[in-house]
A protein has these predicted regions:
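Membrane-helix boundary/coupling elements in multi-pass transport proteins
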Residues: 136-151, 266-273, 332-372
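Helix-loop-helix junctions that connect adjacent transmembrane segments
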Residues: 42-47, 90, 165, 171-173, ...
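A generic transmembrane alpha-helix motif of multi-pass inner-membrane proteins
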Residues: 73, 221, 424-427, 445-532
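Membrane-interface loop-to-helix entry segments
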Residues: 174-225, 284-292, 423-426, 441-457, ...
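Transmembrane helix-loop boundary segments of multi-pass membrane transporters
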Residues: 76-81, 85-87, 161-172, 195-204, ...
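Membrane-interface "cap" regions at the ends of multi-pass membrane proteins
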Residues: 1-85, 97-98, 223, 230, ...
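Transmembrane helix-boundary motif of multi-pass solute transporters/channels
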Residues: 35-154, 266-267, 272, 469, ...
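TM-loop-TM module centered on a large, flexible mid-protein loop between adjacent transmembrane helices
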Residues: 119-122, 126, 161-162, 287-353, ...
Length: 532
């Protein structure tokens, strides 16, 4: 005891341990870098190799927003002359999503990049094709983010308004205020990073999905006339009580239902930040559309059954699940909880979409194809704060300005979702075309992988063409014009970049790689080194 109190052997042992640790650190710092490895990853500014599977699942599920998609997508498919065929539409859309997932996983099993589809496409296409794919993907992220912000403000505003003494719908001022509040929440969460917020994001989405699944089961279980799953499937192709237009109507519904899957691959944007990305990312990309598709199919069955039995007009209703529950005598119990769940699902989707948007801008900034300031990160959270500021300003100021100018909330959402879905589909075409070319280049092309990629690309090209026609016929030509304008500007910008900055063009497609800093023999970054 006296020895310990007077600084005897105990202090000597601690001193020896500290000295030993210092010698090990000095040996590591003085060792030679491993030959053949870069000193550090191109994405060293990010908090690499820290995220587990839960964070990636939260990102992909949040981007799809299965609760919100399952409430809004089926009614659109039904009203577009699909009728009961909407159930077939949902099932076929799930198959298309799985084909696209197979093409994407060609890359996720071999590389990790925050640019996701943009960086993947560069491995199989030329730089111009990759840049156009990335531009379309940016448009997809931004369009869906705008739609989610507007929709979340609308749903939450509806709950607030119905809870007020007047019980009227939300006014423009309330919607703008709530949109700004949601945007602030998105900014805080994305700035802090997925590592600290993924559990919240996943929890919100899981609770929202449970609410939608429970509401769908309630619709199917309430006393009254019902159609079994098999009855709906067998009644789908011919004309029925909902006015199915046969195969053409089913195909129109497939296009709409496919929009309920866009974003399922966005977990790939977290590749460099994920532990064991070549194992985790492919699994998430494969299973996320399956899980989300199951919810969508259940909700579609419930809505087809409900519209057939209640006489609610699917072409008129703005809140289908609410109206169907009300028609079945369940509206009072389900109205506010369901709308809150859907509103929160849209918030989660906005967070995930902005997260992916920011990572894509970061990747482009790292390559130098856009300003390198987008590659700067927060010193503490190691998230791309400059890209966040630019991206969030775009997706927030545009809808707020439109609302203040008197543009109807529904019109803003329709243009945004039309633009976003078109952007996603074009990006999916790019990566589906790139997959077999990449496999052939590395000598791993097989008949199965080629068939899946070709089928996905062919179906997507057909759907993009049909979706453009649907948007034009529905009077939503603005979404098509935005897509055409963005891709045209991207082509002009790329041609100028190739002429004046050819080395930056050659950098397109950079992906994460093991560096000498990642192994024991490497020289770690100096303490206190700037991450920006």
């Amino acid at each position: 005891m006296r020895q310990a109190m007077s600084g005897g052997p105990t202090d000597d042992g601690a001193a020896r341990t500290t000295a030993h640790a210092r010698r090990i650190g000095a040996a590591i710092r003085s060792s030679h870098p491993v030959r053949g490895l870069a000193r550090r990853s191109p994405f060293h500014r990010l908090d690499r190799r820290r995220l587990g599977p839960g964070a990636v699942v939260a990102q992909s599920l949040g981007s799809i927003a299965p609760a919100a998609a399952s409430c809004t997508t089926p009614v659109l498919a039904i009203s577009l002359s699909s009728g009961s065929g909407a159930l077939w539409s949902a099932l076929i859309a799930l198959v298309v999503a799985l084909l696209v997932a197979a093409a994407i996983n060609v890359f996720t099993r071999r590389m990790a990049a925050p640019g996701s589809l943009y960086s993947f496409a560069a491995q199989g296409l030329n730089p111009a094709g990759a840049f156009l794919t990335g531009s379309a993907l940016l448009l997809g992220y931004a369009g869906i983010a705008v739609m989610c912000l507007v929709a979340s403000a609308g749903y939450i505003g509806g709950v607030v308004a119905r809870s007020s003494p007047t019980g009227s719908g939300p006014g423009v001022t309330l919607v703008v205020f709530l949109l700004a509040v949601v945007a602030a929440v998105v900014a805080i969460i994305v700035r802090r990073g997925t590592s600290t917020t993924w559990a919240l994001l996943l929890g919100v989405e899981v609770v929202s999905v449970i609410a939608v699944v429970a509401a769908s089961i309630a619709l199917l279980a309430v006393p009254g006339d019902h159609s079994s799953f098999g009855d709906v499937l067998t009644a789908a192709p011919p004309a029925d009580s909902l006015g199915s237009a046969g195969l053409i109507g089913v195909f129109a519904g497939v296009i709409v239902c496919t929009s309920g899957f866009v974003g399922f691959e966005s977990g790939a944007a977290l590749g460099p930040e994920t532990r064991r990305p070549f194992l985790v990312i492919p699994r998430v990309v494969r299973w996320t559309p399956i899980a989300s598709g199951a919810v969508l199919v259940l909700a579609t069955w419930a809505q087809v059954d409900g519209f057939s039995a209640t006489g609610v007009d699917p072409a008129v209703t703005a809140v289908p699940m609410h109206d169907l529950l009300t028609a079945r005598g369940l509206g009072d119990a389900w109205s506010i909880p369901l709308d809150l769940a859907v509103g929160c699902s849209f918030v989660a989707c906005a967070i995930a979409s902005v997260t992916a948007l920011v990572r894509l801008l970061f990747a482009m900034g790292t390559e130098g194809v856009i300003t390198r300031r987008f590659s700067l990160v927060h010193r503490r959270f190691r998230t791309p704060v400059v890209a966040l500021s630019a991206g969030l300003a775009l997706v927030v100021l545009v809808p707020i300005a439109a609302l203040l100018l008197g543009v109807p909330q529904r019109m803003i959402a329709e243009v945004a979702v039309g633009t976003g879905v078109l952007g996603y589909m074009v990006a999916y075409v790019g990566v589906s075309v790139a997959a077999p070319r990449f496999l052939r280049r590395i000598g791993e092309l097989s008949a199965a992988s080629a068939a899946a990629s070709v089928a996905a690309a062919a179906f997507l090209i057909l759907m993009v063409t049909a979706y453009v026609g649907m948007q034009l016929s529905a009077g939503n030509g603005l979404a098509v014009l935005i897509l055409a304008g963005v891709l045209s500007l991207a082509a002009v910008y790329f041609s100028l970049l190739r002429r004046h900055r050819p080395k930056r063009v050659q950098a397109i497609g950079v992906f994460d790689a093991t560096s000498s800093e990642d192994v024991l023999q490497s020289a770690p970054a100096a303490p206190g080194a700037s991450r920006t």
